[in-house]
A protein has these predicted regions:
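Class I (Rossmann-like) S-adenosyl-L-methionine-dependent methyltransferase catalytic domain
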Residues: 1-33, 50-131
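Short catalytic micro-motifs in class I SAM-dependent methyltransferases
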Residues: 42-46
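A conserved beta-strand element that flanks and buttresses the S-adenosyl-L-methionine
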Residues: 39
Length: 131
């Protein structure tokens, strides 16, 4: 959301000017350039339809030149977020989504405490583009 982006910019201070910030519906995003690093903190797990997931993969496959960093709800995470259905992933299932173009480098899970004092388990994975 725009509010989340603003909070992230505030945390980064002057360094925020070094980041390309984009607020968009990912399924309608039309990149006009390539990206060396793509960091998705919590978008991919909201894509539950095959068409949406495939569109996301088309975008990153076409416009990410080096590294892909993705945070999703793990298989031990919630089934819904903010009332919305989500997709859960483990390292293998997330890797299978991106392995034609990207190679999994690392994955780990981490508990995140929400502002409502609940715990959500996330999977964070880093990928590098295959030559």
């Amino acid at each position: 959301s725009g509010k989340a982006l603003e909070r992230a910019k505030e945390r980064l201070g002057e360094k925020a000017k070094l980041v390309t910030w984009i607020e968009s519906d990912i399924t309608e995003f039309k990149p006009n350039r390539s990206y060396s690093i793509w960091h998705d903190r919590a978008t991919f797990h909201f894509l539950t339809e095959k068409k949406e997931i495939n569109r996301y993969k088309e975008i990153v496959s076409g416009f990410v030149t080096n590294n892909l960093l993705i945070g999703t709800f793990s298989v031990n995470g919630p089934l819904k977020c903010s009332g919305l259905e989500i997709s859960q992933y483990d390292s293998n299932s997330l890797n299978s989504q991106f392995k034609p173009t990207f190679e999994l480098q690392d994955s780990f899970t981490e508990d995140h405490t929400t502002p409502f004092d609940t715990t959500q388990n996330f999977l964070f994975s880093s990928f590098s583009r295959k030559p």
